[in-house]
Amino acid sequence: MASKSQHNASKAKNHNVKAESQGQWGRAWEVDWFSLVSVIFLLLFAPFIVYYFIMACDQYSCSLTAPILDVATGRASLADIWAKTPPVTAKAAQLYALWVSFQVLLYSWLPDFCHRFLPGYVGGVQEGAITPAGIVNKYEVNGLQAWLITHFLWFVNAYLLSWFSPTIIFDNWIPLLWCANILGYAVSTFAMIKGYLFPTSAEDCKFTGNFFYNYMMGIEFNPRIGKWFDFKLFFNGRPGIVAWTLINLSFAAKQQELYGHVTNSMILVNVLQAIYVLDFFWNETWYLKTIDICHDHFGWYLGWGDCVWLPYLYTLQGLYLVYHPVQLSTPNALGVLLLGLVGYYIFRMTNHQKDLFRRTDGHCLIWGKKPKAIECSYTSADGLKHRSKLLVSGFWGVARHFNYTGDLMGSLAYCLACGGGHLLPYFYIIYMTILLTHRCLRDEHRCANKYGRDWERYVAAVPYRLLPGIF
């Protein structure tokens, strides 16, 4: 959206303007009973869900029903299952501490140089979106650089110098899970304490009066240590997403070690998910304007989620293929590849069209035509009035969140690569469908509050959310 700000001359209206505008960004100020129950449920059961999936693969070859049947029929007790679970080890703790420290070093102390020689890549110091309090934060965008350095050192150490086995991640997968949980809870707790005692921007904090909701959804909007270490950008991208491709490579190496070859399904999962990861880091500057940075506060949802949920559940397909080396027929493999690539194309081009429209203030061509837009206005918490444009051309004229549609197509491709033998690898598409549908509805609720009647005009122009003619 192209925005121009003009000062609101009436200071007397500022308080009311701020109160009205709070619905535009971030999480709620007040907590209804359904939200509270949902938060407590996730706090209690999300860690168990992660453990259950990983344990099911480790002890039951990825069967989701076998552990339940064993306990129900008395063949095993919960204590038996727990006793077989590998504990945290000194080796895993050292590996994880080294990993996180290295990513902190790359993020904080190595300014980006990739933008100097990679045509089209935008890195280095970049501005984020305006916050509810009217603040524009600056970020050191260097995720692609961190990914390249990390993977270069991985290949050198694992394959040339042989300092460690490329299967090292798989071999320590459950002990590393406990380490990731420790970091996830530690950073979430620290962020909450920081929000109460020494927030980076007090004007952007939200307190509901409910401990569980504050802990889960966060208090601070953009918690930082010093000038550049931004919790959101670091934990969203590093260490989880940088690790994503390394985890998959370790799973592929384990498959090679166990069976003497790597299946085409494992190659598909590695390639398709690597495309997504590289896209994330290539467009990290664009990510600064997305919902995670622009709307979500930093709490357990992001802190623990990025440390544990993302690296452990987003990689289930590769883990499953270690235990079940599926070899797809050539037509099926090509079909999965095509679905993944088409989904990625829709995802990327949809986002590119919006970015192009923003950068040029609409002075561009989309699908060979001058783009159409709905003119909108809104007022931020600091009393500034902003003007925006909502794109209704290209993919944005097909559906209001067609980028999510492409994302879901790619997610389905990851799962289909694993065949139809088990439910476990399909958790990802189920989860992403729920997540993106929820984000879609949440985003539209915010936009309705933010733009009012202008949003109604936009909905009339683009009537479908995700699937044209259906939803």
UniProtKB/Swiss-Prot annotation:
Identify its membrane topology class: Multi-pass membrane protein
What PROSITE patterns is this protein classified in? STEROL_REDUCT_1, STEROL_REDUCT_2
Q: Does the keyword Secreted apply?
A: no
Q: Which GO terms describe its biological process?
A: blood vessel development; cholesterol biosynthetic process; cholesterol biosynthetic process via lathosterol; lung development; lung epithelial cell differentiation; multicellular organism growth; positive regulation of ferroptosis; post-embryonic development
Q: So which tissues is this one expressed in? A: Highest expression is detected in liver, followed by kidney and brain.
Q: Provide a GO CC annotation, any one.
A: endoplasmic reticulum membrane
A Pfam family hit: ERG4_ERG24
- Domain of life of the organism in this record? Eukaryota
List the coiled-coil residues. Answer: none
Q: Which UniProt keywords apply?
A: Cholesterol biosynthesis, Cholesterol metabolism, Endoplasmic reticulum, Hydrolase, Lipid biosynthesis, Lipid metabolism, Membrane, NADP, Oxidoreductase, Steroid biosynthesis, Steroid metabolism, Sterol biosynthesis, Sterol metabolism, Transmembrane, Transmembrane helix
Which residues are NADP(+)-binding?
354, 358, 391, 396, 403-404, 443, 447-451, 458
From the UniProt record, give the pathway where this protein acts. Steroid biosynthesis; cholesterol biosynthesis
What EC number(s) is this enzyme filed under? 1.3.1.21, 3.3.2.11
Q: Which GO terms describe its molecular function?
A: 7-dehydrocholesterol reductase activity; cholesterol-5,6-oxide hydrolase activity; NADP binding
Name the catalysed reactions: cholesterol + NADP(+) = 7-dehydrocholesterol + NADPH + H(+); 7-dehydrodesmosterol + NADPH + H(+) = desmosterol + NADP(+); 5,6alpha-epoxy-5alpha-cholestan-3beta-ol + H2O = 5alpha-cholestane-3beta,5,6beta-triol; 5,6beta-epoxy-5beta-cholestan-3beta-ol + H2O = 5alpha-cholestane-3beta,5,6beta-triol
Q: Which InterPro entries match?
A: ERG24_DHCR-like (IPR001171), Sterol_reductase_CS (IPR018083)
Q: Note the subunit structure.
A: Interacts with DHCR24; this interaction regulates DHCR7 activity. Interacts with TMEM147.
Q: What's the stated role of this polypeptide?
A: Oxidoreductase that catalyzes the last step of the cholesterol synthesis pathway, which transforms cholesta-5,7-dien-3beta-ol (7-dehydrocholesterol,7-DHC) into cholesterol by reducing the C7-C8 double bond of its sterol core. Can also metabolize cholesta-5,7,24-trien-3beta-ol (7-dehydrodemosterol, 7-DHD) to desmosterol, which is then metabolized by the Delta(24)-sterol reductase (DHCR24) to cholesterol. Component of the microsomal antiestrogen binding site (AEBS), a multiproteic complex at the ER membrane that consists of an association between cholestenol Delta-isomerase/EBP and DHCR7. This complex is responsible for cholesterol-5,6-epoxide hydrolase (ChEH) activity, which consists in the hydration of cholesterol-5,6-epoxides (5,6-EC) into cholestane-3beta,5alpha,6beta-triol (CT). The precise role of each component of this complex has not been described yet.
Similarity-based family: Belongs to the ERG4/ERG24 family.
Q: What is this protein called?
A: 7-dehydrocholesterol reductase
Q: Which organism is it from?
A: Rattus norvegicus
